[in-house]
Amino acid sequence: MSGSFWKFGQDFGSQSPLAKLLNRAFIKIDDKPTSTEAGKIDSNSTDESLESNSFKSEDEEEEYELPNREEDYKAYKPNLSLLNDLLDDEELYTELMCSNFKLLVYLKYPEVLSKLIDYVRNSTILESNIDRVTSEDRDLVRGEDKDTTEDFENAKADKKNIDGTFEEKERTRSGEEEELENEENDSASEDTRVTLPHELEEHDDTRRARIAAEILSADVWPISSALIENEGLLAKLWSILRLPSPLSIEASTYFMKINERLLDMNMDGIIEFILKKEHIVDDFLAHIDNPPLMDFLLKVISTDKPEISNGVIQLFKKQNLVPKLIHLLDPVFDSCTQSAAGDFLKALVTISGNCPNEITSSIGPNELTRQLVSPNMMKQLMDIMLKGGNSLNNGVGIIIELIRKNNSDYDTIQTNYTTIESHPPTDRDPIYLGYLVKMFSEHMADFNKILTEKKIPLLQTSYGTIEPLGFERFKICELIAELLHCSNMTLLNEPSAYDIVRERDAERERIFNSQNYVDSNDRSELKENEDDNTGDADDEVEDDTNQVESANTSIDGEEVIDKLNSLQIETNKVNQNMNNEEQHSLMPDFNNGDFKDEEDENPFEPQYSDVILDSSDIEKNFRVSPNVGDQLKISLQDTRVIDTMLEMFFHFQWNNFLHNVVYDVVQQIFNGPLKIGYNRFLLDDLLINIRLTDMIINGNNECIEYEKGHDTRLGYMGHLTLIAEEVTKFTAYIEEMNITFENTEVMSSLFESKWIAYTEDVLEDLKEKYNAILGDIAEEGDMLQDEEEDAVYDKGERTMGTVDDYINDIMQMDNVRCQEEEEDEGEGYVSFDEDEPQEYRNGDSVRSKESNSSEGKRDQEQLYYEYVNEDGTKTRLNFNPDSDATEQVPGEVNRDHKIPLKLKRSFTDACKSETIPNNTVNAKEESVFQFSNELSDGWESSPSNSIPKRASPSKNGMNSPMFQHQFELHSPTDEFGGHKDEILSAEGHDYDIDEYDELSDDSDEEYDNCEDEDSLDYADSAAYALCRSKSKDKISWDEEEQARLMGVVKFNSEHYRD
């Protein structure tokens, strides 16, 4: 591959600089050359080649020709002194991706891979700034380059000396040409080397480190496989994590690229190596603010899938990954470290959600997130958040992500419907958020204190001096809104759910501890057995040794069983103690109250009456032993947090983020359950104590006064209107469902006269403005009226009609313009089928040969259309039939058919190929359609002359229009609508059938009167079919339609004549 793209001035047959380097990159183990003589040619072999009168180059190739099989390279070792030259060659990576055999073999040597890792771990790369290279490092780099350059120059000098000797002996012209060729190759080799100015020489190791990282992370199986199989090389690479922080972004990026490649190629091998590291968590957390390293750590965690667990999550749990991350949120650390720890925890929660199909890397609930929501971790996180500052912001983000990604309503198996026997607890059980909600319920007063007492200096803006809300207060409001969402989850409102989850957690912990105990005993027994086997190796009696080992094994097994039983007994005791402590706590557990025996007054039972029981006695029963969801709602009411948030809503008039959060809280309360849970009492408090309706009215009045002085509305008015609409929707709901409250003050607040006046006047006007269409409606309406009045058609000016008539006229005018454009484009493209048995007749057209003078006189007075079927029968359509005329053409049947209004819906597909049924109509029967003057909706059509022709399906070589339609005749005596005669092929019309369906005024009557409903679905948007149904309507065609059809006949007679 090295000769595929050669340099200018070089022969294609000459070797590339990289190929020359690779020829000298291997040293035979038997030769043992020194570092300075690695590239030299043996003088004895040169003398022999001179005596044999052969070319030097051929002798070198024969003597130093490298093997073609990889197994033969075991007798060679790499020439490490050429590695710098290889890395400086610009074609190295290209040749590597092209699978250069010699290059792959050279790079697979452990010595070469170790050297490449040294380049990645170079001190210059590990430092965060390249300019901080010490003089010693600079001298070291220059010294290595100097040694490599001297070796290369010595090799070239020896080569030139040999060439000179050869020239003196031979004096041939071929020798001189060979010398020139070698000199050109040497100069080309020097030119292709990547050289830098003198002041940038210290960047050579940076460039080589980048190339080394690209080689180690390349998609080349031999290199990756050789790296994974050598655990010493992996340990050397991972030693980067042991270096002090901060680690440069270049070094961490190289580390991530290389290990991601190895992880994708051989996941089991890398995971096995990771599981052996005892301090991997500490190594990564030492560089917590290094994004590439933390991203790689998250990817390692995502490899532990629910269906195939590899033990990574258990390893990180043992090494306390989550507690250490929470500790890093403390304000004692700098803000960058806090933010990095918070971001990693949020990313961990994201991939651990209970909806595994949301993202590709999702691993579902696991022990790490379960440890995160445990009571101890929540208590630690709560204490850190109450310190305020950046810790509060990061903590709120973690809590919100936990709630959003672990909604118990989406769990596949609901925990409250399971038992330990039916569903034994596993490490992949859903995450229970009850501990989290319970902890925040107990500390809600502390968060409310931050809301009310936090003071921030005033801020000068273009609108004047304002008081900023502050990020802490906004985050607390956002947290409260999310906790209210969480408290409405079904599992958190089940009285027995808390006890069930605690029991499952205790059982899960017991199983986990027992497994660890058994594993530790197995490992200790294995070591003891190994020691026993070593100590008894010199024993002469083997049978006695086996008996002793079997006895020891049985004794150890009994001890393990006894210890497991004792562990289970201790666990049960611990559970009992925990239950007893919970029963005597300030917030008692569920199902522990006197109201259990009073089934008639159980507030947790859903109410099926129309009266909402919200009396003070019911509220007291709820407070005796509330469930987790109700605990949060009670804390919200007791701390008056919602009242504080509403006051902030009107105080911070321009903070739309706060307005959106407050609206979310109010919306949840009004849309929450009324007959179960404590939500009804929050609603009562919102309407009675807080007086939400009065706050809305006062806020609107304040906005009106502000608008008079500043000519602009206050910033909260948009969300205030939304809150008012929630109140009106709730009022409409209770009226529709005939719901009343036991507390009469609720209904009184909803039906106060001032609130009714506000909703009927102010709120309706606001809603009308919000729903108005943008633009000048009056001007647009006048323009539409003028266009409707000026609409003119073929027969003169039409009188004012309905809106549907106007839209129909506009559609027809557009279709006329489209058809005229098609005529201009398709001029000269139309041909006519000469063999088609059709004749188009008009008052001025040519008569058929069978017509006589009497028929000619009648044709001048009467317009009709006549054609001949394949079976020899004739069919005539009279456009203006004379009601008194009784004369008939011999052999024809002349009947007056009434065309129903259903004609608009009877369209056929113009793009379908024409098929003429055989013997579907009586050969002696001919139908003549008579059009009357009663149809009000005329068609505007213009025949198109741009219809492409195709051969008829029935006659090969016959030209006929490609786009056709048929006027379908339905026999009046056909009860089933199955006899049709497709009689006419004409040009297509570009009408939208869906639009005609929408404009139809009597679609229901048409469907009812239609004999065959399938005919309505047979239509398509490209053509029409005149249909006859059993409809008894008296509507007939008017003069406008007659004139239009006359135009069609005249056009066809002029363009499709023989």
Swiss-Prot record:
Pfam families linked to this entry: SAPS
Residue ranges, compositional bias (Polar residues): 42-55, 934-963
GO terms (BP aspect): G1/S transition of mitotic cell cycle; positive regulation of potassium ion export across plasma membrane; regulation of signal transduction; tRNA wobble uridine modification
Basic and acidic residues: compositionally biased ranges: 135-146, 153-175, 190-202, 838-861, 967-991
Family matches, as InterPro entries: SAPS
Crosslink position(s): Glycyl lysine isopeptide (Lys-Gly) (interchain with G-Cter in ubiquitin): 20
GO molecular function: protein phosphatase binding; protein phosphatase regulator activity
Further facts: Present with 11200 molecules/cell in log phase SD medium.
Name of the molecule in the record: SIT4-associating protein SAP185
Organism: Saccharomyces cerevisiae (strain ATCC 204508 / S288c)
UniProt gene name: SAP185
